[in-house]
């Protein structure tokens, strides 16, 4: 393929499809992490393209913390029904039984038990040897130094000093029993690339990415949306109704919105052209301790 004849988005698309097909051919039991966000939606679209007109040859996995936005769960179920892919939803049963939540136990403990430990449970239960994720290198500094094929040991931990060289398009997927690879086909995309591709390909996304008047509270420098009656208000907090949208989606008590009037894809792209901060600025789990994301990844987080 003549790379000079492709736009940069088509080059990114071709690279991602190549990686997805490579994993499907090389591994015995791959799975695709489906977090329902914009990156997952793009990755799902690329995967459908990679195997069209056939069905996706591996399942999608959503590790549900029980604290996702209601719109996310509605979108997840509707998307699975529309495209007919095999969707596995896993919740950490011990965490649910213990009533782990972000209000009483804090973001770090909640994330570790409900997301990291929940993910490791699911990977062990189904014996997956490769897991796709939608992380991009431009999101956060620990993700910037991670390979496309990210090696994980039998405990699913990541050692940034023990990574394999990746020369051009040659990926090393050789693993021993119990080991696995996390695969990031969107590594070289930027947030702006994602939004431009969503616009060009007419990809459906969760409505929370578009600005609307929503109930929010000011907390720890973020606008937290009041998504259901489990939201615990602190002393002095008052619910306000503001025009906001989300650049990133996660557990609703830990995800900050931004004030915005952008309710179309073209308006979002215009915002991205002048944005000076990462979308991860709105994720409390990235800032709950020093080196937070790298520490979580070392422990098995995506």
Curated annotation (Swiss-Prot):
The Gene Ontology biological process terms listed for this entry are: hydrogen sulfide biosynthetic process; sulfate assimilation
* Top-level taxon in the UniProt lineage: Bacteria
Q: Where is this region: Disordered?
A: 280-302
Instruction: Give the EC number.
Output: 2.7.7.4
Picking any one GO molecular function of the record gives:
sulfate adenylyltransferase (ATP) activity
Keyword Nucleotidyltransferase carried by entry:
yes
Instruction: Name the chemical reaction catalysed here.
Output: sulfate + ATP + H(+) = adenosine 5'-phosphosulfate + diphosphate
Name its pathway. Answer: Sulfur metabolism; hydrogen sulfide biosynthesis; sulfite from sulfate: step 1/3
> What are the entry keywords?
ATP-binding, Nucleotide-binding, Nucleotidyltransferase, Transferase
Pfam families attached to this UniProt entry: PAPS_reduct (PF01507)
Class in the EC hierarchy, top level: transferase
UniProt keyword annotation of Transferase present:
yes
**Purpose:** With CysN forms the ATP sulfurylase (ATPS) that catalyzes the adenylation of sulfate producing adenosine 5'-phosphosulfate (APS) and diphosphate, the first enzymatic step in sulfur assimilation pathway. APS synthesis involves the formation of a high-energy phosphoric-sulfuric acid anhydride bond driven by GTP hydrolysis by CysN coupled to ATP hydrolysis by CysD.
Which family does the similarity line name?
Belongs to the PAPS reductase family. CysD subfamily.
Give the quaternary structure. Answer: Heterodimer composed of CysD, the smaller subunit, and CysN.
Name this polypeptide is given: Sulfate adenylyltransferase subunit 2
The species this protein belongs to is Vibrio cholerae serotype O1 (strain ATCC 39541 / Classical Ogawa 395 / O395)
What gene name does this entry carry? cysD
